[in-house]
UniProtKB/Swiss-Prot annotation:
The keyword Acyltransferase does not apply. Residues 123-298 are annotated as: 44 X 4 AA tandem repeats of P-N-[AV]-[ND]. Residues 112-116 are annotated as: Region I. Residues 349-402 form the TSP type-1 domain. This is Circumsporozoite protein. Residues 301-316 have a biased composition (Polar residues). The N-terminus is involved in the initial binding to heparan sulfate proteoglycans (HSPGs) on the surface of host hepatocytes. The N-terminus masks the TSP type-1 (TSR) domain which maintains the sporozoites in a migratory state, enabling them to complete their journey to the salivary gland in the mosquito vector and then to the host liver. The unmasking of the TSP type-1 (TSR) domain when the sporozoite interacts with the host hepatocyte also protects sporozoites from host antibodies. The TSP type-1 (TSR) domain is required for sporozoite development and invasion. CSP has two conformational states, an adhesive conformation in which the TSP type-1 (TSR) domain is exposed and a nonadhesive conformation in which the TSR is masked by the N-terminus. TSR-exposed conformation occurs during sporozoite development in the oocyst in the mosquito vector and during host hepatocyte invasion. TSR-masked conformation occurs during sporozoite migration through the hemolymph to salivary glands in the mosquito vector and in the host dermis. PROSITE patterns: TSP1. Sequence repeats lie at residues 123-126, 127-130, 131-134, 135-138, 139-142, 143-146, 147-150, 151-154, 155-158, 159-162, 163-166, 167-170, 171-174, 175-178, 179-182, 183-186, 187-190, 191-194, 195-198, 199-202, 203-206, 207-210, 211-214, 215-218, 219-222, 223-226, 227-230, 231-234, 235-238, 239-242, 243-246, 247-250, 251-254, 255-258, 259-262, 263-266, 267-270, 271-274, 275-278, 279-282, 283-286, 287-290, 291-294, 295-298.
């Protein structure tokens, strides 16, 4: 089998090489034929009949290419070559003679300028030329000079004078005027104005200002001062008066009021208090008295005895109330907010795991707390964290408080995971 494959490969290679050589031969002949068909003689009418020479071999092809090269190198203009071809067959003597003739013919020609004679004036000359004209006139002089110009003009005039100057300018103008004067100055300005006036004066100043105003007035005076202020105000008023004083204060206040009154008095005091209150009331009354005392209490209950707690006389509702309060206390233990002690213990417990993410809830049942480090304090060492300023806290509430339910739920989850692992 290998021998057959080798023989087939070699024979295919030889066959392809033979075809490639044959293709090269025909391709060369075809290209030569196309070139030959495009060559014309000098007359431009007959084609070179060289097509049949391409089939006689390499020598004929070389001759054909040589002939084509010669024909392409020739100049199509026969008139340019006739003189040279005719000159090639002549003798040296005739050639020398022809060269002399050619040099004579090729001698450069110089055109002479036309010079008018003395008695022949220029026919194109200006017939109105002044015979007495200044022979030294500037040939570049302005041809549009004003014929009515001042003959007595200043010969030392400023050559850089403004060509657009005002022709109606004042001839009596001040020669020492300020060259930098304001061109937009007020033409109706006061000629008797104060030469020492303030150059930085307020341009929007009040033209009706008081001419007798106080020159020593306060420059920082209040621009929004009350224009209707009391002209008889006390000149010795307290400069440190309270700026936040009550603007609606009683104008008829008691002038003999106690100057040492309590500054921390209750702002929500009863404005309708009894004006005839007992002046000898107990000054040491209980400040923590029950504000929600029953106003409709039975006055006859006070005579049932002076006992307290379990020492009270028999009351039919006492046992019922005590049992209800006990049940409510147990019930509310799970809903009350965590105390400061609980928060502090929880922070110490998870101090090493604190981060900027919220921690798990501190309880599994009821209300707990979640904490995290504030983003601005994330780079502080954990032992330098301030629980008040660097720790953020929030209340979390856990609804599922049944331990039995938690155990069953965890057991079901564990069974599902194990069954998935072993069954697969």
């Amino acid at each position: 089998m290998m021998r057959k494959l080798a023989i087939l490969s070699v024979s295919s290679f030889l066959f392809v090489e033979a075809l490639f050589q044959e293709y090269q031969c025909y391709g060369s002949s075809s290209n030569t034929r196309v070139l030959n068909e495009l060559n014309y003689d000098n007359a431009g009418t007959n084609l070179y009949n060289e097509l049949e020479m391409n089939y006689y071999g390499k020598q004929e092809n070389w001759y054909s290419l040589k002939k084509n090269s010669r024909s392409l190198g020739e100049n199509d203009d026969g008139n340019n070559n006739n003189g040279d071809n005719n000159r090639e067959g002549k003798d040296e003597d005739k050639r020398d003679g022809n060269n002399e003739d050619n040099e004579t013919l090729r001698k450069p020609k110089h055109k002479k300028l036309k010079q008018p004679g003395d008695g022949n004036p220029d026919p194109n000359a200006n017939p109105n030329v002044d015979p007495n004209a200044n022979p030294n006139v500037d040939p570049n002089a302005n041809p549009n000079v004003d014929p009515n110009a001042n003959p007595n003009a200043n010969p030392n005039a400023n050559p850089n004078a403004n060509p657009n100057a005002n022709p109606n300018a004042n001839p009596n103008a001040n020669p020492n005027a300020n060259p930098n004067a304001n061109p937009n100055a007020n033409p109706n300005a006061n000629p008797n104005a104060n030469p020492n006036a303030n150059p930085n004066a307020n341009p929007n100043a009040n033209p009706n200002a008081n001419p007798n105003a106080n020159p020593n007035a306060n420059p920082n005076a209040n621009p929004n001062a009350n224009p209707n202020a009391n002209p008889n105000a006390n000149p010795n008023a307290n400069p440190n008066a309270n700026p936040n004083a009550n603007p609606n204060a009683n104008p008829n206040a008691n002038p003999n009021a106690n100057p040492n009154a309590n500054p921390n008095a209750n702002p929500n005091a009863n404005p309708n208090a009894n004006p005839n209150a007992n002046p000898n009331a107990n000054p040491n009354a209980n400040p923590n008295a029950n504000p929600n005392a029953n106003p409709n209490a039975n006055p006859n209950k006070n005579n049932q005895g002076n006992g307290q707690g379990h020492n009270m006389p028999n009351d039919p509702n006492r046992n019922v109330d005590e049992n209800a309060n006990a049940n409510n206390a147990v019930k509310n233990n799970n809903n009350e907010e965590p105390s400061d002690k609980h928060i502090e213990q929880y922070l110490k417990k998870i101090q090493n795991s604190l981060s900027t993410e919220w921690s798990p809830c501190s309880v599994t049942c009821g209300n707990g707390i979640q904490v995290r480090i504030k983003p601005g304090s994330a780079n502080k060492p954990k032992d330098e964290l301030d629980y008040e300023n660097d720790i953020e806290k929030k209340i979390c509430k856990m609804e599922k408080c049944s331990s039995v339910f938690n155990v069953v739920n965890s057991s079901i989850g564990l069974i599902m995971v194990l069954s998935f692992l072993f069954l697969n």
